[in-house]
Regions:
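Conserved helicase RecA-like core
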Residues: 1-187
Length: 187
């Protein structure tokens, strides 16, 4: 069981592409709003068809494409049929032993999230963080990802290759003229 602060940090990391896979319960899945979600994998089929369709709707939003994989037992086929009826299309089926991995290495996310102690209360804005990383420290805009400024803290995604150095340099530097504490959120 995660505390709310830990849950928020995990969700920020996932949304920032600092975490490749997020495993969530049905309760957690209902509260997620993450853009460009490539895939949803269900380890069971929800008996409530509307809830299941809402859950898998987390992928392929706003005209984007996404993949939904349902791991279904024979006992759940009735639920699958109802989902197919609601969506107006049939599912594509594969036996589990026919599936092969796409690669042989681990899923390494391209970004790492930095946690900055300081947020809206300190009048920090996303542009201030971007400016500190690009203009002050010389990183490129392409090396900086999503920036989330909350009341007391800020999260910024940076390219994995520069994460440790960027955190160290931000700790030694300033954002908006103020010293800040920065740490790398661990995978």
């Amino acid at each position: 069981e995660l505390e709310q602060r830990e849950r928020d940090q995990v969700l920020v990391q996932f949304a920032n592409r600092s975490c490749s896979v997020l495993v969530a319960t049905d309760v957690a899945a209902r509260g997620l709003d993450i853009a460009s979600l490539a895939a949803v994998i269900n380890v069971d089929v929800t008996p409530d068809t509307e809830v299941h369709v809402h859950r898998i709707g987390r992928t392929g939003r706003a005209g984007e494409t996404g993949l939904v994989l349902n791991l279904a037992s024979m006992k759940e086929m009735g639920y699958v049929g109802k989902i197919e009826q609601l969506q107006g299309r049939e599912s594509e089926w594969h036996k589990l032993d026919e599936l092969t991995p796409a690669g042989d290495g681990p899923l390494v996310p391209p970004m790492v999230t930095l946690h900055i102690q300081g947020g809206r209360k300190e009048k920090i804005r996303p542009g201030d963080v971007l400016g500190a990383l690009t203009a002050d420290l010389g990183y490129t805009r392409e090396q900086v990802g999503k920036i989330n400024v909350n009341e007391w803290s800020t999260y910024v995604a940076v390219d994995r290759a520069i994460a440790a150095q960027a955190a160290s340099r931000l700790n030694a530097g300033r954002i908006k003229g103020k010293s800040v504490k920065v740490r790398v959120l661990e995978d």
